[in-house]
Amino acid sequence: FFQDRFEGMELIYSLEEKTLFTGGAVKMALSRCRDENVFIVNGDTFFDVDLAAMAQRHQATGAVLTVATKEMEHFSRYGTVQFDDSGRIIAFREKQPCQHGAINGGIYLLKRNALDAISQEKFSFEQDYMEAQVDSVPFFAFPSSGYFIDIGIPEDYAKAQEDFQTR
């Protein structure tokens, strides 16, 4: 841990006493945040995204949720994010073989109060919030061409170790 500060930023930790799933954990962490918009980052991916530009887009669109997306070719281990010409997300598709598409890169910018209406303590951020609300809440994509790697499997973890030595 970085204690309570890192490079001038105040750090506040949110520790789960019991399993809350992704949505419950995010909701609990949001309750400790003070800013109106909060970045959420998956712990098992690395995605080089311009966070300042993502924040500007989030504000400009009036999004409740902005999702960093990455265009990929020939994949099956990720679901896809479909969005219209304005960047408004219109659908999240489950994992299936895909020739070309945008994936959820695991970086989000979310309004702090976005999950307040969810009464469940344990829920999935992706399924019970994102997929359930995509038709009624303004979610926007933030496409990025930055380096992306998911280290959730041993082969990609090893690849990340090699890649970071040369970066």
What residues fall within each predicted segment?
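Conserved N-terminal catalytic core of the sugar/cofactor nucleotidyltransferase
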Residues: 1-42, 51-53, 83, 117
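Short, well-ordered turn and helix-capping elements at secondary-structure junctions
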Residues: 2, 15-17, 69-70, 93-96
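Residue-level detector of anion-binding/catalytic polar loops
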Residues: 12, 64, 138
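Short loop/edge segments at beta-strand edges and connector loops
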Residues: 15, 42, 67-69, 143
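Residues within well-formed alpha-helices
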Residues: 21-24, 28, 57, 67, ...
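Catalytic-core segments of class I nucleotidyltransferases/pyrophosphorylases
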Residues: 37-39, 46, 52-59, 72-75, ...
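A short, conserved acidic/glycine-rich loop-to-beta-strand motif
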Residues: 61-71
